[in-house]
Amino acid sequence: MLDVLIRGAGPVGCALALALRNSGLRVALLEASSAPPAFRPLALSYASRLILERLGVWSGLNVSPIERILVSQAASFGRTRLDAADAGVPALGYVTDYAALLAQLRAQVTTTTEVSEASCIVHAEGAPQDTEGKRYAQDAIVGLLQAEPPSTATAFERFTPEGPLALLPLAGRYALIWSMRPERAARLVATSEAEFLRELNAVAGGAIGRGTTIEKRAVQPLALKVRGARVEGNEVYIGNAAQTLHPVAGQGLNLGLRDAWDLAHVLGRAPAAAAPATLARFAAQRRLDAGATIRMTDFLAAGFAGDNALLRAARGAALTALDIFPAPRRFFARRMIFGAAALP
């Protein structure tokens, strides 16, 4: 019998398998589907870089660094700038494509389609289907944008009444993640390139210069789904199987990688992988980081949307305060990078 069966060979499941490879535990990684992933931009935090370096996959990954993030809101006052130097890191994050990261991880693991008995079952197969959660009044359009001038190492996060617009530097272009009303998303994903760029450039407000072409447009529905219990008997839930977040601030995968790293740390040091005390220790260890990240993401997604004078003033005041006072700005940047708990 296996010690650990990991269900789901996405980035989080693969990361856990790699983190356990020298633990002495008998581990299997179960892949249910081999469908090629669609274009999906990822913003990996510096903390995720540290994890991937320890797993031996970082050096082969093509990434574009984010050295600064310019944050603003549309049609109102309030802006701030987050810099890597202020946060004490070489980069705030790194942009890559989901498929590229998955290929690097899959190259170093062995997967199976055979279900085996195991003392501990880890669910890393994606968003929980049996959790209702909260559906945001937003869908996200993702795509690959060419702009003039080309992207450098600056990312843009622009809050609009319908939802946030993120533009992330990726190999001289921008990865686009644009949240908006579902009916508008359905229209814009199907409209002409010229009309799409016209509306995008109007919302971006000249922050990136001018978008000139857009490729790989797709729509993603947005919801917050949080599993009630991270541990149930000998079963553990990590990554999107434990919590599915809004893409604002790019926290979802980074939180999932921290889940995997902490679980590997706990399982690798335990005399029995599925012992109740072992799994309870993992759940307690993840409570602060996961809870704080979920609340922050939900606040940014829902609390920073809406279009009335009071909300605009509150958003503007919050951004202005971050811009004026370096201590809270550094705290916010490091919280986005490392979560609410440092790496073990």
Language-model-derived ranges and their functions:
Residues 50-54, 58-144, 148, 152, ...:
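Conserved N-terminal helical subregion
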Residues 7, 30, 122-124, 239-240, ...:
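Active-site flanking residues adjacent to catalytic metal/cofactor-binding acidic residues
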Residues 187-274:
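FAD/FMN-dependent oxidoreductases across multiple families
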Residues 3-5, 9-67:
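Glycine-rich FAD cofactor-binding loop and adjacent beta-loop-alpha segment at the N-terminus
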